[in-house]
């Protein structure tokens, strides 16, 4: 099931607290459950997207940049900020 805005907000807040630079929302197309992937400052967000998107029944749905305004990103239809 697609993640709710509330769930995504919680994941983004957790990412901010842990010092992540981005939160990637990934859908497992086996059971259609969404989950977060946290990108640390020593990781490449593009690499983290590439190793997941379209592989092993995974689909990257959104990318939140934690250095940008979170509320604006949450209001977008599909956030994609690498």
Task: Give residue spans per PLM region.
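Short, mixed-charge low-complexity intrinsically disordered segments
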Residues: 2-3, 50-82
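Short amphipathic alpha-helical segments that mediate assembly, nucleic-acid/protein binding
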Residues: 5-9, 45, 70
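Ser/Thr- and Asn-enriched, surface-exposed coil loops between beta-strands
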Residues: 21, 43-45
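Short N-terminal "domain-start" leader segments
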Residues: 1-18
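A short, exposed loop/beta-hairpin motif centered on an aromatic-Gly-Thr core
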Residues: 31-43
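Short aromatic-glycine-(Arg/Gly/Cys) micro-motifs in beta-strand/loop hairpins
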Residues: 14-33
């Amino acid at each position: 099931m697609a993640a709710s805005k509330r769930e995504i907000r919680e994941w983004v807040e957790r990412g901010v607290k842990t010092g992540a630079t981005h939160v990637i929302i990934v859908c497992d197309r086996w059971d259609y459950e969404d989950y977060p992937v946290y990108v640390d400052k020593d990781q490449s967000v593009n690499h983290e997207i590439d190793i997941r998107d379209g592989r092993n029944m995974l689909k990257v749905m959104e990318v939140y940049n934690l250095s940008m305004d979170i509320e604006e990103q949450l209001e977008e239809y599909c956030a994609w900020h690498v």
